[in-house]
C-alpha cells in the first residue's frame, strides 16, 4: 500500500471510529456481543505454526498458507489481536491468500474481528475491488446489519466499489447503530463524486442520525465546501418540485 493510500485509509478509519463513538455505548456493546467470531484456542505446541500462518497471510504468501492449511490449520484462525485470517488478508490487500481462503470450504466468509468488521468491509475501505468482487462471487452479504461495507467504501471515496455494492443490492441508506448513513460518511470525507453517486442512486439527504445530523450537517461540520454546495443545490431542487 502506498503512503498516500495508507494515509487516506487511516483517515477514513479515524472517521469511522469517531462515528462509531457517536453510537449508544450500550447498543454498540450489544452489537459486538452478538457478533459471531470463530477463534482458535492456540496451545504452545501450535504457536509457531500459527505465527507462520499469520505471517504468510500478511505477505500474501499463498503457497505458505496452503501448506499450513493442508496440515490441518484452521482457516478461521485469528491473530493475537483477534483478527481472523480472512479479515487480515483484506486489511493487507493479500488478494492471493484471500482467494485461497475463500475457496476453502471451511472458511467463514462473514467472520468478524473484535470491532465487528469483516473482510468485505476492510476490502471496501481499502479500495480493493478485486477482493470485493471475490467475496461477492461467493455470496458474501453486502447488507451487513449496522456498519456495512457501503459505509466503508463511501468513507474513503471508492466510487467503483460503491457502484459494485449498489449493483448487488446494497441498501443505499443503510444506517449504522447511531443512524449514520453512507452519504453522511462520504460528505464527512469531502468525496464529491461519491456523494453524487449515492444521491443519483436514491440516497436520502434529509435523513438524520441519532444526534440529528444530516449529510449536509456533516459537510458543514467538517468544512467540506464543495460538498456543502452540492448538497445545498440538491435540497433546493427538491424544494422546487
What are these regions (language model features)?
Residues 2-18, 25, 42-53, 138, ...:
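Ankyrin-repeat-protein effector appendages
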Residues 64, 96-97, 130-131, 160-161, ...:
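Conserved ankyrin/ankyrin-like repeat signature
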Residues 66-74, 99-108, 133-141, 163-171, ...:
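Ankyrin repeat domain, specifically the short helix-to-loop turn at the C-terminus of the second helix
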Residues 77-78, 109-112, 141-145, 172-175, ...:
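Ankyrin repeat boundary signal
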Amino acid at each position: 500500500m502506498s503512503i498516500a493510500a495508507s494515509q487516506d485509509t487511516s483517515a477514513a478509519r479515524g472517521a469511522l471510529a469517531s462515528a462509531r463513538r457517536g453510537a449508544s455505548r450500550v447498543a454498540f456493546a450489544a452489537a459486538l456481543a452478538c457478533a459471531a467470531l470463530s477463534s482458535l484456542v492456540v496451545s504452545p505446541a501450535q504457536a509457531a505454526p500459527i505465527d507462520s500462518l499469520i505471517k504468510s497471510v500478511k505477505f500474501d504468501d499463498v503457497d505458505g498458507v496452503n501448506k499450513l492449511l493442508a496440515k490441518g490449520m484452521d482457516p478461521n484462525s485469528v491473530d493475537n489481536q483477534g483478527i481472523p485470517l480472512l479479515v487480515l488478508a483484506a486489511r493487507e490487500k493479500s488478494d492471493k491468500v484471500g482467494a485461497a481462503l475463500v475457496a476453502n470450504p471451511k472458511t467463514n466468509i462473514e467472520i468478524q474481528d473484535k470491532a465487528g468488521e469483516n473482510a468485505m468491509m476492510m476490502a471496501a475501505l481499502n479500495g480493493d475491488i478485486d477482493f470485493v468482487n471475490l467475496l461477492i462471487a461467493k455470496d458474501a452479504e453486502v447488507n451487513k446489519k449496522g456498519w456495512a461495507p457501503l459505509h466503508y467504501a463511501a468513507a474513503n471515496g471508492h466510487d467503483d466499489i460503491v457502484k459494485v455494492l449498489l449493483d448487488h443490492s446494497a441498501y443505499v441508506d443503510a444506517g449504522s447503530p447511531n443512524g449514520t448513513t453512507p452519504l453522511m460518511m462520504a460528505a464527512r470525507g469531502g468525496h464529491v463524486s461519491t456523494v453524487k453517486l449515492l444521491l443519483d442512486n436514491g440516497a436520502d439527504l434529509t435523513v438524520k442520525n441519532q444526534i440529528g445530523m444530516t449529510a449536509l450537517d456533516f459537510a458543514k461540520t467538517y468544512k467540506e465546501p464543495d460538498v456543502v454546495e452540492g448538497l445545498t443545490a440538491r435540497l433546493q431542487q427538491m424544494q422546487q418540485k
